[in-house]
Amino acid sequence: MSKRHNSADFLSILKKHGITKLYHFTDRDNLDSIVANGGLYSWADCEDRSIAIPKPGGSNSSRILDARYGLQHYVRLSFTPKHPMMFVAMNDGRISNPIILEVDLDVILDETTKFSDRNATKNGAYIGDDIEAFKCIHFNSLKADTHFDLAPEEQMFFQAEILVKNHVPLSAIKNLASFGISLSKSAVKRASRIPSTAQISRQTPTAFIFLVDHSVSMERMI
């Protein structure tokens, strides 16, 4: 990782707003592949590496939009474990047993990481890779429990994104132990295989293992 020269400025903003981790939602059935391949890859990098995704969170239309805007090689992370697109993916049947992976803030400090003030493929999204782009994120809106708690004109900013180039390594995923996975210096070991189920709805949005992708794109609004 090529670390930013002004990393302290980014960390200061995160500390000011009480942000300690990032999140990525995926399906429980994808976890074995994530571990076996050493972390989270963008869907395009998965294709390049012939990595099969058992239950992809993104739709075909979202992939088309990603490619159109040059975002296909980025892993999407969010600031919330209750990402609206997780529920969309569930309703569409793409995922059925969602889990949330928690990701270390250090990925923000990589010079290749980009930031978007809303879903990166949505009309009007401000995307950049510097401190000014980072400051455009509506951090106060991220403090809401869900996007429904925000005014309609502010709800889009609840989906602010961290776009990590190509790959989030296993070492950056902080809650693997919650899934019975332990990391050693030389290998990732499957400690146990404990089935987990989850029932998530708008009424019970937290009834799952809090472990964070977001990696689903919304269609660009015209």
How would you name each of these model-derived features?
Residues 1-76, 82-187, 191, 199-201:
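Active-site-proximal loop/hinge segments that shape catalytic or ion-binding/gating pockets
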Residues 77, 222:
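Phosphate/oxyanion-binding active-site loops and adjacent basic polyanion-contact surfaces
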Residues 184, 188-210, 214-221:
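Acidic, polar low-complexity linker/tail segments
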